[in-house]
Amino acid sequence: MQCNDVQATEPDIKVSLTRVGVTNLKKLVKLKRTNKRDIVLLPTFEVFVDLPSSQKGIHMSRSPEVIEEVVENILLEKEIYGVEDLSVEIVMKLFEKHEYATRAEIMLYSDYMMEEKSPVTQKDSQEIGKIIARAYGVKDENGKIHVKKMVGAEVVGITACPCAQNMLKENAVTSLKEKGFSNEEIEKILDSVTIATHNQRGIGTVMIEVPNGYTVGISKIIKIIKDSMSGEVYELLKRSDEAFVVETAHKNPKFVEDCAREMIKRVVDVFDYLPEDTQVLVRQVNKESIHRHDAFAERNSTLRELRDELKTLTN
């Protein structure tokens, strides 16, 4: 008995859909690295294709089948070194399996283990960041497929609020004056102590388009994010390390907007070799300690726009 292809039938409501697919799909992936051992990841995949108004549904099983085939076969046959290149392979395969699709997209997220040392005692510890890849393909009217790919990272750090710190500094000045200290003495005291403020756990994200013929190092992106907050966080901290982390953050207070702008400037400086039309996404989310809400800042732009803005500021 032959089964009808229900997905290929016409829907009751003839409206096209932008993205249909599967999310929260995990697969073990092994990627090659130049002159280093292979890296093993357990990424989460989200894969989508568009659906025309004339078709009831996509062939859903084909999407996880694509990932299975790419992971099991293509990775063995090809030397794939980056998650962004893996994403491109999956997008191209999605078009093969979903012949009715004119758009295909994949998002990939994976924990990324980094070897770090605590800042003072130099204790070894494993720190976890998150690497991200995205590929987006469009099939033109001639059947040619155009794919863009992006790679990025998400890193946790610490931020210290400049506003509360400034208010506490003003309170300290007033209190010291009432106790009879001179302005010179007050200045020396304030230079010798760390002024308190409230902190946030900051989550920085940078995504950068990878044009054909170019490479974008994930380790460089991770460093940009780390260096753009008030300070780094560590899994393992002894007492002297903890004091160092807290003091460092309080001596480098930053708003959520400051972190986002710092990442933008560092991206422009570090990736000065990338073309003008390269797409860049920068996002900072600060988990507030004295509020129930979070603070958020984001910029989605091209390198040309960012370079022009920064150039205007320096002139």
From Swiss-Prot:
Pathway per the UniProt entry: Cofactor biosynthesis; 5,6,7,8-tetrahydromethanopterin biosynthesis
EC numbers: 3.5.4.39
UniProt site (May be catalytically important): 161
Reaction equation(s) it catalyzes: GTP + H2O = 7,8-dihydroneopterin 2',3'-cyclic phosphate + formate + diphosphate + H(+)
The keyword Hydrolase is assigned to this record: yes
Pfam families with a match to the protein in the record: GCHY-1
Reported cofactor(s): Fe(2+)
Record note on cofactor: Binds 1 Fe(2+) ion per subunit.
Any one GO BP annotation for this protein: tetrahydromethanopterin biosynthetic process
GO molecular function list: GTP cyclohydrolase I activity; GTP cyclohydrolase IV activity; iron ion binding
Its biological purpose: Converts GTP to 7,8-dihydro-D-neopterin 2',3'-cyclic phosphate, the first intermediate in the biosynthesis of coenzyme methanopterin.
Family from the record: Belongs to the GTP cyclohydrolase IV family.
NCBIfam families: GTP cyclohydrolase MptA
PANTHER family referenced in this protein's UniProt entry, alphabetically: GTP CYCLOHYDROLASE MPTA
Subunit and partners: Homodimer.
Full protein name: GTP cyclohydrolase MptA
Encoding gene, per UniProt annotation: mptA
